[in-house]
């Protein structure tokens, strides 16, 4: 019985070690966040997704699209406008925004006009976007490894978070996932009053060309 007991204990220990994501010493939180901010400032393009769970008190409910560091972007945004969800397709090219709702064709507005509602191109903007959000984090603590990412608990100031998620005006105790190899942001979970906003990124630096939608 004793050899069998030892074998069972050994298996339990091995499984526990694997499931913990352990393996090597975890990096210091502030150092990792500094690397992450620098990595995000160097990003040339990315695919992004913003989703909500529950009923967080923000007008942006969902967004999916592509971004370039130059500020061009395209995709779809779902906004809560006076209690009614409205999905808008968009293409931001230079200072011109092409957009359309559920019906009708594309119309145009300026980037400044779009910014009154939500400008997704700010996400990769170094001084207001994700890079600045990571640089402004306080008390980052690396909790462990999940898949190929470090899971980090940290707090983001509301002023900076609100640039990316309009309607946020208070500090957010967030969980973020940073790629181990590149330190780029893979995902961020932002608990807010009423629910949670999750921001995800993929396809970093893939070739992206944003073109105007067909006329008519």
Where are these regions (language model features)?
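Subset-of-secretome marker
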Residues: 18-216
